[in-house]
């Protein structure tokens, strides 16, 4: 029997595990997973590929063609006629995405795409900073994930070690703290928890434990009994 469809928004700081957890929830309930940050990464990729400077929002906007960025209903990100979903994970793109995500007009473009995409649809789980109050303010279930910066840095180090990536703990911690500062102090849609979001501190819990907690919240919201303990 298929699960009832609701829309879920997952918010929280960088490195807290939003994507991993949201993917597991999406797979469990057969929902569509959308990583909102991938759109900022795609714009950063487009600028890098086309040698567009990101130091000025005004100049950058002039070089972005109409309707150049889109999503499909498998959650893939498209730049014009190219699916770039698997081309967006490297340090330079991450760094540049963090910069352009501060620009109000860029955030407006991304938010409009995401809101148009989810309009009149259910069964979508979106994750990203500002998802719970700006991108998906009418979500049926809102979750704000949290963990202290040191815990997030340790998790990132473990992940990088597994991927055989050379990284230093202090460098990771510094990058996470810097990203937190940018997210919390930006003028447009800063990182914050809304009053209607459920706060989950993941610091002392495993990923599976958090997935289990969120699953129970979903079951409760859709009015179905959960066999999970």
Swiss-Prot record:
Entry's EC annotation? 2.7.4.25
The enzyme's main class, written as a single word, is transferase
Is Cytoplasm given among the entry's keywords? yes
The principal location of this protein is cytoplasm
Q: What is catalysed by this protein?
A: CMP + ATP = CDP + ADP; dCMP + ATP = dCDP + ADP
Chain positions recorded as ATP binding sites: 12-20
**Do you know which CDD domains this protein is assigned to?**
CMPK (cd02020)
The record's listing under InterPro entries reads: Cytidylate_kin (IPR003136), Cytidylate_kinase_dom (IPR011994), P-loop_NTPase (IPR027417)
Q: Does the entry feature the keyword 4Fe-4S, yes or no?
A: no
Q: What Gene3D superfamilies would the database entry show? A: P-loop containing nucleotide triphosphate hydrolases
- Gene Ontology cellular component list: cytoplasm
Alphabetized Pfam families for the sequence = Cytidylate_kin (PF02224)
Biological process terms from the Gene Ontology for this record are: pyrimidine nucleotide metabolic process
The UniProt similarity line reads: Belongs to the cytidylate kinase family. Type 1 subfamily.
The molecule here is called Cytidylate kinase
């Amino acid at each position: 029997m298929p699960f009832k469809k609701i829309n879920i928004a997952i918010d929280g700081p960088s490195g807290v595990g939003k994507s991993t957890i949201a993917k597991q929830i999406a797979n469990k309930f057969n929902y569509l997973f959308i990583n909102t940050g991938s759109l900022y990464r795609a714009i950063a990729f487009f600028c890098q590929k086309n040698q567009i400077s990101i130091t000025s929002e005004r100049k950058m906007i002039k070089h972005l063609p109409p309707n150049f960025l889109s999503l499909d209903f498998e959650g893939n990100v498209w730049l014009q006629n190219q699916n770039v979903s698997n081309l967006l994970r490297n340090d330079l793109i991450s760094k540049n995405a963090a910069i352009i995500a501060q620009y109000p007009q860029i955030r407006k473009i991304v938010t409009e795409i995401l809101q148009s995409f989810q309009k009149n649809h259910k069964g979508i789980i979106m994750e990203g900073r500002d998802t719970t109050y700006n991108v998906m303010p009418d979500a049926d279930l809102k979750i704000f994930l949290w963990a202290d910066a040191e815990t997030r840095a340790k998790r990132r180090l473990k992940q990088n070690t597994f991927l055989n990536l050379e990284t230093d703990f202090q460098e990771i911690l510094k990058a996470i703290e810097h990203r937190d500062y940018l997210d919390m102090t930006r003028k447009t849609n800063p990182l914050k928890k809304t009053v209607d979001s459920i706060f989950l501190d993941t610091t002392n819990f495993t990923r599976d434990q958090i997935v289990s907690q969120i699953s129970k919240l979903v079951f409760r919201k859709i009015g179905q009994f959960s066999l999970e303990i």
